[in-house]
């Protein structure tokens, strides 16, 4: 009898191990393995998260049985993959059931939470205020995406007749998953009543992705 070739023997052992592992998995109780809090999704951006289970009798099927996924996302009943591009911000809670192929079938249910967040966040650090000769303030920024972005920020004060005056301009590379605690702005202005507008635009040229965030004062500021 000829000795087994090493490659054939290795393939045989791998096959035996895989079959043994599958048998062990099938003999174990059905269980959802994915953590209850899913990775955040970015508004309007492509998203994918895979739900996983172990035990029970494969193949398994998945279904949302309570609550709802964020608009724009869907659950694949075969693979357990949640994918799509969400169209609404918020924190979403929903329950998912997995069913195996045993006879009778076994099921398990788990509630998940999924947050849909803005790619770019701009907030007042120091709200605009009248100074001795104009208006000044500051904002804080957050890039919540996984991309470094080209960021442009423009701050203007618009008076009662619609004339705009520049209060600030910034352009720089904004690192992924980072924040800038304060960016100041301000300038001397003629006497008048002004609404302050902040417009922030981020771009990822390689993906042709653009996001925008805005702020404005709720009431006019009167300079003297």
Regions found by a protein language model. Give the residues of each.
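Short glycine/proline-centered coil/turn motifs in the loop regions
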Residues: 43, 54-58, 67, 145-147
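A short tyrosine-centered beta-strand micro-motif
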Residues: 92, 192-198
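Short, solvent-exposed loop/turn segments at the edges of extracellular beta-sandwich modules
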Residues: 99-105, 203-206
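Strand-loop-strand motifs at the edges of beta-sheets in extracellular beta-sandwich domains
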Residues: 71-87, 137
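Extracellular interdomain linker/stem segments of modular secreted and single-pass surface proteins
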Residues: 28, 115-123, 219-224
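Core beta-strand segments of extracellular beta-sandwich domains
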Residues: 47-55, 96, 138-139, 184
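A short beta-strand micro-motif common to beta-rich folds, especially ectodomain repeats
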Residues: 51, 90-102
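C-terminal edge beta-strand
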Residues: 104-116, 170
């Amino acid at each position: 009898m000829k000795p087994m070739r090493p490659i054939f023997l290795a393939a045989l052992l791998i096959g035996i191990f895989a079959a043994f592992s599958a048998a062990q998995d099938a003999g174990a109780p059905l269980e959802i393995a994915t953590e209850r809090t899913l990775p955040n999704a970015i508004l309007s951006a492509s998203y994918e998260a895979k739900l996983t289970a172990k035990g029970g009798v494969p193949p398994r099927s998945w279904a949302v049985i309570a609550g709802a996924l964020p608009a724009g996302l869907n659950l694949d009943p075969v693979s357990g993959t949640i994918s799509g591009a969400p169209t609404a911000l918020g924190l979403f809670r929903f329950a998912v059931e997995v069913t195996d192929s045993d006879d009778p079938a076994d099921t398990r249910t788990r509630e998940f939470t999924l947050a849909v967040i803005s790619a770019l966040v701009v907030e007042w650090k120091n709200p605009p205020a009248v100074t001795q000769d104009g208006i000044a303030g500051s904002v804080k920024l957050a890039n919540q995406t996984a991309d470094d972005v080209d960021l442009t920020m423009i701050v203007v004060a618009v008076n009662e007749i619609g004339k705009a005056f520049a209060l600030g301009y910034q352009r720089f590379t904004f690192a992924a998953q980072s924040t800038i605690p304060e960016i100041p702005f301000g300038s001397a202005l003629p006497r008048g009543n002004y609404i302050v507008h902040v417009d922030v635009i981020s771009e990822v040229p390689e993906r042709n992705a653009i996001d925008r965030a805005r702020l404005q004062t709720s009431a006019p500021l009167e300079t003297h």
